[in-house]
């Protein structure tokens, strides 16, 4: 599709890709069928999940016409089990989030006021909330179509990704205000940081690029073009050796070798619209929210193959580990619910329902883990939810289409980006 007819807004891109999804998937499957290696969909450590249509289609015991498929691209690649040099050591191999427990604040963020920064993606502002009073205390200009508020690797600066303005707005969390002029970068839908802190990764969704940039100047250092539309969310292996990114409009995941900065393989999830992705505390399973199939895929971190599926709710979207790393919070944007999955059993523990409905999207926990703050994407509000019982504590009006809000400060030694994923 030529640049002249490519929609500038995310909704337009979504409609365009949905319109040609069937043709594109059919063509890709036909061309590459000879090199695909079907994945094994069983894992002795994972409980069976066959109660949902998506899980049934993925089961090898059924005649699925397009089962999940993993394939590699031309190498050679580094050994992905080798830790990334320069990454802070993992304190507890059984829990990669061990250094991000309740109130485990780094010296870099001690004394920083507790605030919620909300990008109003339907406009060009960031709304700032004082969670102690449930009140908006400031609204600041950012740039057109702000999508996420992203903490820097060193925890000292927040960055607003102004998607259609091709810029980042730096915010000083000690003052809660913009900290200088906008920084020009191409198509910043989302942003992450490599576990060694060497690069910022600007997720250029419309361009299908992962742009590796200097984490301070944001000068471009390396670019990876991925052959899947809608690349938008990322998480990293426990070793830091690779990342997995979701491609929403292509129904595909891509694995990138961080030793060599090259694509190491793809995983097809036919009919899926993968959203957020999160690694379990043990570093063994990536959970992938799937909007289309209303649930969460389980991907074996070592083999890059599907091991199960857990139905959660319509428009499954955001994924956040509890502060004690026992549960995964799944936001189901389509029916106003939040599902809790046990990391230990890989089964649903409970589901919380927002009174009167809602559209929970992206958010994060309070530093002590007692409140889950999440944007109401289509209701122009922010929800505060008690993690003790799921009760709604607050419903705070904000700007149009609030998206990837950032709760700050967060516990942890360093930030991997997004809305405040720390380890």
For the regions a language model picked out, list residue spans one by one.
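N-terminal intrinsically disordered, acidic low-complexity segments at the extreme N-terminus
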Residues: 1-3
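N-terminal Sec-pathway targeting helices
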Residues: 8-23
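Predominantly soluble domains enriched in secretory-pathway, periplasmic, or organellar proteins
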Residues: 14-15, 25-423
């Amino acid at each position: 599709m030529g640049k002249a007819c490519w929609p500038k807004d995310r909704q337009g891109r979504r409609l365009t890709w949905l319109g040609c999804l069937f043709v594109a998937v059919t063509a890709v499957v036909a061309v590459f069928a000879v090199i695909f290696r079907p994945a094994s969909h069983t894992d002795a450590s994972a409980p069976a999940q066959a109660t949902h249509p998506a899980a049934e289609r993925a089961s090898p015991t059924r005649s699925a016409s397009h089962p999940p498929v993993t394939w590699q691209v031309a190498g050679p690649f580094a050994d992905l089990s080798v830790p990334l040099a320069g990454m802070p050591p993992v304190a507890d191999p059984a829990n990669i989030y061990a250094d991000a427990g309740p109130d485990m604040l780094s010296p870099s963020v001690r004394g920083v006021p507790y605030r919620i920064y909300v990008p109003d993606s339907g406009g060009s502002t960031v709304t700032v909330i004082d969670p102690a009073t449930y009140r908006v205390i400031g609204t600041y200009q950012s740039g057109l179509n702000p999508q996420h508020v992203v903490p820097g690797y060193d925890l000292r600066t927040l960055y607003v990704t102004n998607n259609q303005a091709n810029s980042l707005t730096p915010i000083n969390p000690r003052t809660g205000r913009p900290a200088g002029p906008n920084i020009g970068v191409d198509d910043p839908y989302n942003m992450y940081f490599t576990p060694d802190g060497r690069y910022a990764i600007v997720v250029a969704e419309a361009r299908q690029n992962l742009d590796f940039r200097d984490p301070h100047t944001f000068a471009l250092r390396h670019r990876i073009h991925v052959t899947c539309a809608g690349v938008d969310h990322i998480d990293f292996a426990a070793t830091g050796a690779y990342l997995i990114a979701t491609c929403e409009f292509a129904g595909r995941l891509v694995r990138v070798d961080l030793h060599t900065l090259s694509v190491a393989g793809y995983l097809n999830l036919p009919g899926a619209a993968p959203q957020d992705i999160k690694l379990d505390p043990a570093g063994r399973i990536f959970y992938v929210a799937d909007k289309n199939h209303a649930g969460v895929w389980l991907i074996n971190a070592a083999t890059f193959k599907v091991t199960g599926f857990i139905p959660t709710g319509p428009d499954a979207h955001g994924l956040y580990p509890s502060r004690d790393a026992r549960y995964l919070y799944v936001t189901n944007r389509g029916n106003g619910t939040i599902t809790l999955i046990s990391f230990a059993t890989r089964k649903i523990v409970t589901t919380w329902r927002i009174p009167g409905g809602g559209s929970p999207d992206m958010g994060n926990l309070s530093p002590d883990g007692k409140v889950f703050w999440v944007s109401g994407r289509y209701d122009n509000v922010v929800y505060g939810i008690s993690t003790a019982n799921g009760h709604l504590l607050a419903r705070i009006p904000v700007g149009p289409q609030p998206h990837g809000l950032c709760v700050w400060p967060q516990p942890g030694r360093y930030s991997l980006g997004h809305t405040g994923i720390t380890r």
